């Protein structure tokens, strides 16, 4: 995992095996191991088999309303299904990703909701269905004197060979709106920002 993420994930005090275990996890910015942002508590994983279908179950002390399940179906179509779950993260964790978050130093809460998410690969074509909603609550930054800046929702919806995105403002001094899509590895997004009256 460290190799795949180019060292951006740091595992410490791991217990168990690759099939079932837990670890302390931290995000590491490109600056190196001294720039670690630990995720509170431990992260747990467990592999199960439902007949011939493997399932990976992941949970985290800090952030998950219930375990997150990844189910892989093999055959003429390869399909990855992700269970419906609510996840809560403090925005301060984003500093562990490095620039630009370590400059912005955002604070607030990030809630992620997954609904019927499936990725299907058939005939070398990826199809996406389902929805992921990101709610950014009480966003603040050291670069802004306005606190909080606002509360925002980003919605990502799978629509076959493309994923559509929308951005809306629920409340706040900075009104943001936008829409876009990801299709054939090309991403476009148009957004508008204005101050509230």
Over which residues does each language-model region extend?
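N-terminal beta-strand/beta-hairpin edge segment
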Residues: 9-103
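Transmembrane beta-strands of outer-membrane beta-barrel pores
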Residues: 27, 64, 76, 136-138, ...
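Extracytoplasmic/luminal low-complexity segments enriched in Pro/Gly and acidic/polar residues
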Residues: 158-197
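N-terminal type II signal-anchor transmembrane helix
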Residues: 1-3
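Beta-propeller and related beta-repeat scaffolds in trafficking/envelope systems
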Residues: 34-49, 125-163
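Hydrophobic, aromatic-enriched interface-forming segments
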Residues: 101-139
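Solvent-exposed loop/turn segments connecting transmembrane beta-strands
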Residues: 15-18, 62-67, 143-146, 168-177
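Residues that define the transmembrane beta-barrel architecture of outer-membrane proteins
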Residues: 17, 37-39, 106, 148-150, ...
